[in-house]
Amino acid sequence: MRPVTAQWVANAVSGTLAADVDAIVTSVVKDSREVAPGALYVAFVGERVDGHDFVPAALAAGATLCLVSQHVDAPHVLVDDVELALGALARAYLALLRTEGDITVVAVTGSNGKTTTKDLLAQTLPDVVAPVGSYNNEIGMPLTVLAADSSTRHLVLEMGASGPGHIAYLTSIAPPDVAIVLMVGTAHAGGYDGPDGIARAKAELVRGLVPGGVAILNADDTAVAAMAPLAERVVTFGQASVADVRASDLTLAKGRASFVPVVRGASGHRMTLSLVGEHHVTNALAALAAALECGMQLDEASALIAQAKPVSAHRMAVTERADGITIIDDSYNASPESMRAAFLALLDVAEGGRTVAVIGEMLEMGDASREAHWELGHHAVRLGIDYLLVVGEGAKPAFDAAVREGSWGDEAAFVGSIGDARSYLSERLMAGDTVLVKASHGTGLYELADELVRTQA
């Protein structure tokens, strides 16, 4: 973070300062355990924890200033709403960086693929700041903005939403120069009034562009392509022949895609992705289009994207265990679209070996939940996945559908808990198996994935 004074912070958030006006702030954190000397500690009040209780610990660790919503015995800025104040601070700070240097804001949204595309750009663009993990909400995104400094040329932001207006708020903090919309799917469907509502929410990113900014849109997704009139400049990507940035001569080997990038008719060198899953071709093309808009050359950008590794945890992480069992950990999140993509990746990685899909509930599906899980069970059987293990009552319709579709005997199984899933797998897995673990993060199924990765039977 570029150093700022306590007075500057107070002015930015329209708060009341009770501290040395010239005290210097050099970082912003919301966890007292992450405080370093010079930090601004942001005291959030949560359902179970009140951040104000940790102000003494923050001071002991060297915090210069605290952002609070109640009086504390420490140098502080007092505000009515800490979350809104954090957004205001990030908004003012980005404006300051823009006046002092050349910084390009690249924002990514979409029902699936946001974090992967962000991670690809973080490993491709020079002088870049991007979050690790999925820091894409009203708290995480401002903290990412505040991690940039005067040397930052590219600020990559992930903008998520679970309802209308969320992305519009995030773009009010950090209006993007480059806006990437990956897809309109059914993730968080419970927060919207149907597919059109989801599309309108994702379009908020395009509406939030700076004047003259460019929208990078998926030509393969009709709802995304329809956002083109909202932007002054548009670059498209995808498999469609009309896309500005597309993939030619696509092949797959053990789940990893290889293709020739074509940009407005000009072919680059073949690139083979390190990421597992054909669906990552879309993410790679989006990242490539953004990198080109940021001034990179085709072959340089494509080479860096090809060699990029998974950074954020529990996202298509493939581990080949010493006992001959391969684990695909994609347990961070789940939607119908990402589940289907993960099933295909499972089959590709297995290359004819025995396949085991361990799936949990897709959360935040609202009234569509039962039907979505039912369709998932049908899909698993139709694809020819050998064994389907469904974990948790919320996902049980997937098991019921698999049985109805013809998954007999022990080809499909239902267990009520992660502990039961652990026992089931320990009795059945053998060398040569490829196991996919996937569910929404809130199910906790990632704990099982971690155990499977650590186990070297």
Feature-to-residue mapping (PLM):
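ATP-dependent carboxylate/acyl-activation modules
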Residues: V108, K114, A313-M316, M339, ...
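Non-catalytic positions within long, well-ordered alpha-helices that form the structural scaffold/packing
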Residues: V55, L59-A60, T171-S172, V381
